[in-house]
Amino acid sequence: MKILKVKYLHDYKLEVLFTNGKITTTDFEMFLTNSKNKCINKFLDKEKFKTVTVDNGFLSWNDGEMEISARSVYNDFSIDTQFANY
């Protein structure tokens, strides 16, 4: 499973489309807030967080400075899941 598309929603929430046809709403607020890693904490700046892209099926920020795998996004950050309506 890989990520096909990502769309910024608001705050630290994203809408993510996976190759399995599912769309999830994800929330990264707790992850970013609780991290003790300075490289991760800087994405608490919403303008930096909004720069998310898809790179080789991963969520990626700042040219790979922070990357999160599709499996981790799906299993650890999803708060709502539905099938895409094609």
Task: Give the role of each language-model region.
Residues 1-86:
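Motif-centric detector for short Cys/His coordination patterns
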